[in-house]
Amino acid sequence: MVNVLLAGGISMAVALLCTKPFIAFLVRRRWGQFIRDDLVHHHVKRGKPTMGGAVIIGAALVGYFASHAVVLALGATGVLKVVRSSISLGALLVLFLLTGLGVVGFLDDYTKIRKERSLGLTSRQKLLGQTLVTVVFALGALLMTDEQGLSPASTAVSFIRDTDIDLAFAGPVVAVVLFVAWSNVLIAGASNGVNITDGLDGLATGASVMVFGAYTVIATWQYNQGCGVAPGPNCYDVRDALDLAVLACAIGGACFGFLWWNASPAEIIMGDTGSLSLGAALAGLAILTHTQLLLVVLGGLFVIVTASVIIQVISFKLTGKRVFRIAPLHHHFEMVGWSEVTIVARFWIIAGICITAGLALFYAEWLTRG
């Protein structure tokens, strides 16, 4: 689709061109990253410009809205016949997640800079911010319907499609409460997963490019095989699928452009401004494309890295011994002696395998229904 590619191309160009001036701005203000004392390999990165996620968010917003404007102009002039998707509620809700968690991440990054420490907001403050943003998203996704009475989200727990597990088993009120709680689990888990993975130059950014690329493919496929376009036993009843593909490509393109400056040796770090917002956007896309649990496969790298932290904490509390030299997992391999570039490359390979497996499951499920 022209608008999908436009969104990705515009956002990539904006991120590529605007990150360097943003780095200069941060350097002038001396807004740099503080590093944990036990990460001896990273002391050289102390003071490196952070909050790069602001560029990703800004570029994604520009790419998304500019692509709609360009496609609208092309359609009006008749220069090019395109399938145009209007700005949708679903995409706006994901953008709300992106910017809302971006604000939470910005406050965390700014607190680190102002107090000159590696820890920003407290866990309780972060959780409160994530919860407030999630509640607004979840209520909008579930309760705001279109002319056909279809809401962007469903009360059913989904894997590749909605499953038989329906949160509305005890009535509509309980369904709303459970959906908000379930959304909070997904969004908090995804945002913190990306946040934990963002420990090496380019690692989380490159992995995010792949996952957003996967959701671009998934949402585009859902549109092309939608029940309103291609009725059949394997069609998808997903609202705003094409526009979600536009947005996924815009965010992925923004990450791709930012990666030019974030790859080793990074000139800027995305910070919590980027990691929390990107994880939340991924969870939002998973919820609205009805592929909630498939995100566990697609974002398998984030799951593995997060699991390493959980395993380390549980092991130390129960036995007093550590499974890894240090957690998260990528820092363990640094302590073992792997170079940063080697770790990132190999973890990207793992991310690619997870993406391939997730897309294969998605396509295989469609084939079995045909």
Kindly give the residue locations of the regions a language model identified.
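Alpha-helical transmembrane segments
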Residues: M1-R29, G58-F106, Y110, T134-D162, ...
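Juxtamembrane linker/hinge segments adjacent to transmembrane helices in membrane proteins
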Residues: F22-V44
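Juxtamembrane helix-capping/reentrant segments at transmembrane boundaries
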Residues: R36-P49, E116-G129, M335
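Membrane interface segments of multi-pass transport proteins and intramembrane proteases
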Residues: K112-T122, F159-L167, S339
